[in-house]
């Protein structure tokens, strides 16, 4: 993803947001990665790490006034949270990021809980057949954003499930992934990136 963004002229960074909790490289399946590492990552730590990555980018030739974010699955949830956290963020694209959940010490709020704080326009890309994110959650998020006067758009692909952009998994949907990528580029451009 970083390479593809770089080819479009972006300075793209993929920070290792799990480094303090462990190395997922040796874990063979996604559910184990989620249970053993991702579930132990605090949202506050992630927001701080993203702020640090943005500061590093600005100090190394990046244009801080054109800061954007995209993320997939867990990173899609983080995209929504960062849009509520980071003043000056230009745009975000959240790929099938969870919108609701139970609060915990590590994850005190979820995207639907921080709608009022979202300052950047966000494009949400979701699959209607996602077993973990019901379309009703997407509809609720869309409704709450609209009521709050926030700028967001959603695309729900009727035949896609979760992880439809992950070309290394059986869930990959080439047409939906390509369409989503085109929409990401257009969204970033339309929002001054």
What positions do the PLM features span?
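N-terminal cap/leader regions of alpha/beta-hydrolase-fold enzymes
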Residues: 1-193
């Amino acid at each position: 993803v970083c390479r593809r963004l770089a080819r479009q002229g972006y300075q793209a960074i993929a920070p290792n947001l799990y480094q303090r909790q462990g190395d997922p490289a040796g874990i063979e399946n996604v559910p184990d990665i989620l249970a053993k590492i991702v579930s132990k990552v605090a949202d506050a730590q992630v927001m701080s790490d993203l702020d640090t990555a943005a500061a590093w980018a600005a100090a190394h030739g990046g244009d801080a006034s054109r800061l954007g974010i995209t993320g997939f699955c867990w990173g899609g949830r983080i995209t929504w949270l960062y849009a509520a956290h980071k003043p000056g963020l230009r745009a975000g694209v959240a790929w099938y990021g969870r919108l609701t959940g139970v609060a915990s010490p590590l994850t005190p709020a979820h995207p639907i809980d921080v709608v009022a704080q979202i300052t950047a326009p966000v494009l949400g890309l979701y699959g209607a057949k996602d077993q973990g994110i019901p379309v009703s959650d997407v509809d609720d998020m869309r409704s709450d954003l609209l009521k709050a006067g926030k700028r967001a758009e959603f695309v729900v692909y009727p035949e896609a499930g979760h992880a439809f952009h992950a070309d290394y998994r059986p869930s990959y949907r080439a047409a939906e992934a390509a369409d989503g990528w085109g929409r990401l580029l257009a969204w970033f451009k339309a929002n001054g990136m």
